[in-house]
Amino acid sequence: SPVIFAGGTFNGHPLTMVAGITILKHLKENQEEIYPYLHEQGNRIANEINEFCSSNNIAAQMMNAGSMMHLIFSGDTIDSARDIGRSKIEKEFYLHLLGHNVIVPGIHLAFISFAHKPDIVDKVIDAFKKSFEDLREDGYL
């Protein structure tokens, strides 16, 4: 019989498969509550960060699609991936953000989940603002 390789830490593991099916059922059963909340909180983070950057003359913008966000260090209009560049400021920003207890993966896409309630979202927004202030103190802005 043919063998199928499924690479990854838990790919194809029966327990992982049950957990995946269970969460998908939960998301479907609660979609009227979960997805609007995620979009609302993702938009809130992006809007507050963008307002902060605009009012503090910081050339950065938070782009989001619901609960997925990406901070771009440019004040210019972003039309394609070619408009996004990596900079030393970006590296320093994420180090400061980590120092304020917010972890963003190396690809610099931030995500929130339904577990991130408004008080946690407030802390995330505050950490972003403090990280921008840290950059300014360090002479990057």
What does each model-found stretch correspond to?
Residues 1-141:
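Conserved N-terminal phosphate-binding loop of PLP-dependent enzymes in the Aspartate aminotransferase
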